[in-house]
Structures are given as structure tokens and as C-alpha cells.
């Protein structure tokens, strides 16, 4: 099929939205969800333009937003507490969307680049699979956060980089 039902962008940094302009150009996208904040890069501007032109629906989401899918799936947004104005001075990582996907009997937590300071999310509960925050940076995915989540599996999304991601301490804590 050439249709994508839904896409959510955790925050407008290029390493999180870099592939979305191509997706929007090449597929029909029903719904694009963001936290409301826009970035100041060419990639971010292109994403915003294409999302406006191509997506059937644009949603600005925050804690409490739930999307129900007909295949017994539910996407629940847990953070940020409120939507973020497009031109907000809030550092983009601090406003990263955090979403829990319940799909049949499996739960996934997507954390964007959420830093340690923002990990005190209300109503957080254990999950089966964790998408590790900020590419495994030492400034995200604290021991306390892992103790709360108790993930059975963890996924680190990272490519070649000069930051040393994933950090060895984070990898050790995931074992």
C-alpha cells in the first residue's frame, strides 16, 4: 500500500525528521502529529511545509492525547504536559514527545531525545520495549527511569556520530 496511517514527530531536530519530507512526498499520509514546536533548519521548514500540504490531518498532541487504531492498538502521549508554541524558546529535546503504543499484548515506549530532567512522567508504568532516549546519550535514560519502566527489550536508534552515542554507561545499564 502507498498509505501511511499516522506519523508522529517527537521534536523538530533534523536527526528526527530528516526522512519525513521524503515520506510525505512519496506516500499518502493520513495524520501527522507533532508537539507544536517548529525548528529553525531547512529540513524542519520543509517538513512543516509538506506536512501542511500533504497530510490529511495535522494534530498537535501532548499528555492525555490518545489515538485508537482499529487493530487493537492505542497510542497514548505522556509528555510534554501541554503543546508547545511553534516559536517556543524551549530547547527542542526538552519538549520531545513521549508516546506509549499498546499493540495487542505488547507495549512500546518512544522517548525522542527526552533528557534526565524530564523523565519524571506521571503515570509511567513498565513497558515491554523501550526506544532508548537521545540515541543512548549519557544525558538520557537514567537508572531510575529504567527501574520504573523495567523494559524486556531496548532499541537504540543511532548511526555514525561524533558524540559517542550510545554511551557505554547507558548500554551497561540496559543489560
Residue map of PLM features:
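Non-globular, low-confidence helical/coil segments that flank catalytic cores
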Residues: 1-175
Amino acid at each position: 500500500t502507498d498509505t501511511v496511517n499516522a506519523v508522529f514527530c517527537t521534536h523538530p531536530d533534523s536527526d528526527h525528521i530528516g526522512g519525513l519530507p521524503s515520506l510525505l512526498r512519496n506516500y499518502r499520509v493520513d495524520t501527522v502529529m507533532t508537539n507544536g514546536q517548529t525548528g529553525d533548519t531547512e529540513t524542519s521548514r520543509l517538513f512543516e511545509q509538506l506536512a501542511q500540504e500533504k497530510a490529511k490531518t495535522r494534530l498537535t498532541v501532548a499528555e492525555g492525547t490518545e489515538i485508537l487504531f482499529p487493530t487493537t492498538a492505542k497510542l497514548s502521549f505522556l509528555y510534554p504536559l501541554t503543546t508547545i508554541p511553534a516559536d517556543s524558546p524551549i530547547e527542542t529535546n526538552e519538549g520531545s514527545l513521549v508516546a506509549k503504543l499498546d499493540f495487542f499484548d505488547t507495549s512500546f515506549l518512544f522517548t525522542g531525545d527526552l533528557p534526565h530532567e524530564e523523565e519524571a512522567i506521571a503515570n509511567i508504568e513498565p513497558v515491554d520495549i523501550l526506544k532508548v532516549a537521545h540515541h543512548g546519550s549519557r544525558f538520557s535514560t537514567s537508572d531510575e527511569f529504567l527501574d520504573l519502566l523495567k523494559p524486556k527489550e531496548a532499541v537504540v536508534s543511532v548511526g555514525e556520530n561524533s558524540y559517542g552515542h550510545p554511551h557505554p554507561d547507558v548500554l551497561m545499564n540496559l543489560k
